[in-house]
């Protein structure tokens, strides 16, 4: 019975991670090890710790605006 429970647990964890990755929204990508200091219009080159943070981040080359949207740097106010 414990082997069955382990298989179910693995399937649930994998499914949860796949759901998170698809819920990022436009111009965002899911990373299992991203920065805790996102690149923003206000701070495009943040100095941050190297700790891994899991979640959705702006796609490469985009910055996060004040509303949390990912935009190209030339669109920053």
From Swiss-Prot:
Coiled coil: none annotated. It comes from the Eukaryota. Its main location: secreted. Residues 1-21 form the signal peptide. InterPro entries: Ser_inhib-like_sf (IPR036084), TIL_dom (IPR002919). Belongs to the serine protease inhibitor-like (TIL domain-containing) family. This is Cysteine-rich venom protein 6. It comes from Pimpla hypochondriaca (Parasitoid wasp).
